[in-house]
Amino acid sequence: IYMDWHWVETVPPQFGSGWTGYSWNTDLFPDPEAFLAELHRRGLRTTLNVHPADGVRAFEDSYRAVAEALGRTAADGLPIAFDCTDREFMDAYFDVLHRRLEDQGVDFWWVDWQQGQHSRIPGVDPLWVLNHFHFLDSGRDSKRPMTFSRYAGPGSHRYPVGFSGDSVMSWESLDFQPEFTSRASNIGYGWWSHDIGGHMWGVRDDELATRWVQYGV
């Protein structure tokens, strides 16, 4: 489920954009647990899209619990910054922030990108760190590890099913994808998810959409 699962347009302006979110949009999902249980009943598994870059802000359902886990005061309402190089933050990121949603029925995570390519440690890319730890965390309790992530460059297929990122709605974009996908197999990248039909810009074209679905199948 893409960003619609969490609050986007209604995030108070003092907190910035709605890209990052960890609280269900109850206007669209009034009973998340029942919704996820019904998907499971139908034999489906659910992944939620996350853009972790803005950390945990005071409007989030888990803000107080994350603040307490980090020994901070929730009353000040200060944002808890995303920091993939901070062990304590990453522990709270998984054990509090994500575990609450997994306990409701979320099966795995769709890690998206807003974090940039740099962290406090030179040469450490946040998306690589997220891929590594999401993969390991998903394998706890002897489960088969599973994570779904935006492409982080050659070699990143060590961990996730790859999401190739935003694609333009055009014939040129569709023409590129088969070659791109086939060439990826040359370096062992065998699991891909593309935006079938395109994601942005371009034009609406029913023939294009049909051919894109045909390619995806």
Region locations from a protein language model:
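Catalytic-domain carbohydrate-binding cleft regions of carbohydrate-active enzymes
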Residues: 1-217
